[in-house]
Amino acid sequence: KVDTRYCARSAKPTTVAFVKLVDGQATYAFYDENTAGLLLTQDQLPHLPAAVSTLFFGGISLVNDPAATTYEALQIREAPARVTMIDPNIRLGFIAGKEGPYRARIERMIARADIVKLSDEDLHWLSGGGDVAQLARAILAQGPKLVFITEGAAGARAVTATQNRFVAAQKVTVADTVGAGDTFNAGALCALHEAGALTKARLSALTDAELDAALTLGTRSAAITVSR
C-alpha cells in the first residue's frame, strides 16, 4: 500500500506518456502541458516528519518549471538532514532545446545528493566517453557517497570512494524495458533500507555485502519487470 498523505492534490490532468516498442526497446513521447505534475509549486510542498529518511528525485519532473525548480528547492531544504537520491533518467526528446538549463540543474542536484543512479547511456551523456567506473568516481568527487550504474543486459555496478562492485543481470526473455530503471531503484533502496543503511553516516561505510545485496535486489527486480 502506498502512503499518499504527503501528495499534493490538484484538479489538473495527469502527465501522459506514450511508449513505442520496437523489439522490446522503448521510445517515449510525453504530453505534459498544464498538468498537475508540471504546475507543482513550492507552497504545495509538505512538511515531512523525522520518520521519512530518504527522498528520491528524477525523471521528467526535473525538466520544466515550475515543477523542476520546486523539486530542486525541496532537495535544498531536505538534503542537510535526510538522504537524497537522484536518477536523471534522461529523455533526449523531452529536453530538446532545454539541454543547457537541464544539465545545469542535474549537475547541481547530483552534487547535493547522497546517492546517484545513472544508466551507462545517461552517464556518457553527462560525462562523456571513458571507463564507467572512472566516470562514476568523478561524480563521487562532486559530493555523492554512492553511485549506481546500470549497464543494460550486462548488469549493474555500485561505486564508492573505495569500492567497485558489479552484479550480473538475471537472464530473462525481454517483453519490454519500460520501468526497468525505476524497478532497479526501488530494489536497491529497499535493500539499503533493510540493512539500516539509509543514513548519511552509514552510506559512507557500506560493506561489500551490503552493496552486493542492493545490486542483487535491484537487478532481480528489474528482470521481473522487463520479462512481463
Language-model-derived ranges and their functions:
Residues 128-228:
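Conserved phosphate-binding/catalytic region of the ribokinase-like
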Residues 22-25, 101-105, 136, 163-167:
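Short, hinge-like loop/turn segments at secondary-structure boundaries
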Residues 34-42, 96-101, 129, 203-204:
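Short gly/ser/thr-rich secondary-structure transition/capping motifs
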Residues 1-60, 64:
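Conserved N-terminal subdomain of the carbohydrate kinase-like
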Residues 45, 106, 174:
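Acidic, amphipathic alpha-helical patches
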